[in-house]
């Protein structure tokens, strides 16, 4: 295995998808290697069940977002996000893959997102959802520290 110093730094291949009506920002960690993509949009790996779950929940059809048996429909995914006010992005802008796979366990974040910059583009955003531990850890590391909340019960 190569050391992180000899592995290439990958820049994020997609820009944030931020519809004007974004109320919810969904953040993952980083896309899988391009060889695993079935569309040019977020969660492109046909093995990932996110689009199937959303199809089942919103349309009672786990195949709703499938264009073919081996590809998701980028157009349907984007239309859904626009309709529901869902923005999508990742918490890492540059990474090093310690192994040539999609596992968050083997991603080294070089440059995290700037949440202030992203949120400034979506003033109606009410919530942020992260899709995994790596995304959560990366997001938290970019936020300023906060004081302990005051307890009203002693």
Each language-model region and where it sits:
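C-terminal edge-of-domain segments
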Residues: 150
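Conserved small/polar residues in nucleotide/adenosyl-binding loops
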Residues: 153-154
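A polyanion-binding, active-site-adjacent surface
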Residues: 2-127, 133-147
């Amino acid at each position: 295995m190569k050391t992180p110093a000899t592995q290439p730094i990958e820049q994020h291949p997609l820009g944030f998808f931020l519809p004007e009506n974004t109320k919810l920002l969904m953040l993952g960690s980083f896309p899988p290697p391009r060889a695993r993509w079935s569309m040019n949009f977020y969660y492109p790996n046909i093995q990932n069940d996110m689009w199937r779950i959303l199809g089942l929940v919103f349309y009672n059809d786990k195949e709703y977002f499938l264009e073919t048996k081996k590809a998701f429909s980028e157009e349907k995914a984007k239309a859904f996000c626009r309709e529901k006010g869902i923005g999508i992005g990742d918490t890492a802008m540059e990474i090093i893959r310690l192994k040539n796979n999609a596992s968050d366990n083997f991603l080294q974040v070089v440059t995290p997102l700037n949440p202030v910059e992203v949120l400034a583009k979506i003033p109606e955003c009410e919530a942020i959802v992260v899709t995994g531990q790596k995304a959560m850890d990366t997001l938290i590391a970019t936020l300023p520290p906060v004081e302990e909340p005051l307890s009203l019960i002693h």
